[in-house]
Swiss-Prot record:
Record function comment: Negatively regulates transcription of bacterial ribonucleotide reductase nrd genes and operons by binding to NrdR-boxes.
GO BP terms in the entry: negative regulation of DNA-templated transcription
Lineage: Bacteria, Pseudomonadati, Pseudomonadota, Alphaproteobacteria, Rickettsiales
A Pfam family that the UniProt record links to this protein: ATP-cone
Ribonucleoprotein found in the keyword field: no
Name of this protein: Transcriptional repressor NrdR
Note describing how the cofactor binds: Binds 1 zinc ion.
Biological source species: Neorickettsia sennetsu (strain ATCC VR-367 / Miyayama) (Ehrlichia sennetsu)
Cofactor(s) this protein requires: Zn(2+)
All copies of domain ATP-cone, residue ranges: 49-139
Length: 149
């Protein structure tokens, strides 16, 4: 594993732990070159997932890209990193269980919204406003109304 601080390719694992009922491994690493310590996470990927984007192009599913969009929605919200990882694991599990090797970006967005709706309503609204291309305050009012009814 490459050190994110100095670029050295020779790092050592100091500690490994199974997390989230064994669905991923948390590793504490040490760089012998610069002395930096950092954490990595390994996740299980059962099959290659291809995402069909709105414009028709196709690309490999990028967990980190999806995770970043969720983290933006959750910024300054009282949700732990572990809970975000659990949310993403749940989304990926649903994708792999329900769909073939290809899935639309629309379905992925809906699965993320479904998970966020149960985790944090504010993050759900933030994510939905970007995902659903809200144009004005009426879009927010309509979504919030659907949450309270």
């Amino acid at each position: 594993m490459k050190c994110p601080f100095c670029g050295n390719r020779d790092t050592n694992v100091r500690d490994s732990r199974s997390v989230n009922e064994g669905t991923f491994i948390k590793r504490r690493r040490f760089c012998g070159e610069c002395g930096a310590k950092f954490t990595t996470f390994e996740t299980i990927q059962l099959k290659e997932i291809k995402v069909i984007k709105k414009n028709g192009s196709c690309e490999s599913f990028d967990r980190e890209k999806a995770m970043r969009s969720v983290e933006v929605a959750l910024r300054k919200r009282p949700v732990t990193r572990e809970r975000v990882d659990e949310l993403m694991n749940s989304v990926i599990y649903k994708i792999e269980r329900i769909h073939d090797a290809k899935i639309t970006a629309k379905v992925i967005g809906e699965l993320i919204m479904e998970e966020l709706a149960t985790l944090d309503k504010v993050a759900f609204i933030r994510f939905a406003s970007v995902y659903m291309n809200f144009e004005n305050e009426k879009d927010f009012v309509q979504l919030i109304g659907s949450l309270t009814s």
